[in-house]
């Protein structure tokens, strides 16, 4: 579980995607671009935050 994740509007999400794509066109790997943008968002985000639970177990048995 992750607490305090930024809650982004659709517009904010779109801007993040565009920023990731911009960094990738400048030669940055996708993973590095995603990490960079995530750090930028965490550093500047002032809106709501959410708690997220990621379940990696495969329930299809």
UniProtKB/Swiss-Prot annotation:
What cystine linkages occur within this chain?
A: none
Q: Which family does it belong to?
A: Belongs to the UPF0181 family.
Its organism's taxonomic lineage begins at: Bacteria, Pseudomonadati, Pseudomonadota, Gammaproteobacteria, Enterobacterales
Q: Which Pfam families match?
A: UPF0181
| Record protein name field | UPF0181 protein Ent638_2380
């Amino acid at each position: 579980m992750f607490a305090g994740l930024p809650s982004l509007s659709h517009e904010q999400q779109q801007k993040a995607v565009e920023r990731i794509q911009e960094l990738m066109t400048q030669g940055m790997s996708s993973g590095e671009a995603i990490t960079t943008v995530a750090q930028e968002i965490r550093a500047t985000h002032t809106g709501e935050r959410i708690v997220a639970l990621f379940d990696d177990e495969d329930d299809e048995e």
